[in-house]
């Protein structure tokens, strides 16, 4: 679970925040960065952040689970989540046809929240060529120095984790499986 502790938080006190959307809202509110100052545009950013938190992220998580980790292949679940993933990519592509970034001409926390979920589009079974606005947006964001730095840090962490960074979750121990999925590991 993503979490931060701001040593100089609310009222100058240590403040802990968990969940990525809450962290992004907190940091943008505190710094005034990556969120518009006028309420109308701010609400648009909130809407797209919530779209990612409640729809895009969870549905793509289900695609990954049923395609790659479920001990039994369930055709209905695979088809249902693949169709929903494709639909959501279409929604995002349509939105991105209106501007350089998710909510228009400015890079915001909505872009920050959505981009990582598109990293594994091929593994999600998505043909990115069918979504040209997403492809353009991804390229634009990948050219940002901060995004490049984030991916460098991710690669460093993965390298440090070595064997612990298991790409096939079926290789997890029973205890690791229980912590991740909340159930006993299937035989």
Indicate where each model-derived feature is located.
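N-terminal, helix-rich and Lys/Arg-enriched segments in bacterial and organellar proteins
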Residues: 20, 49-51, 137, 151, ...
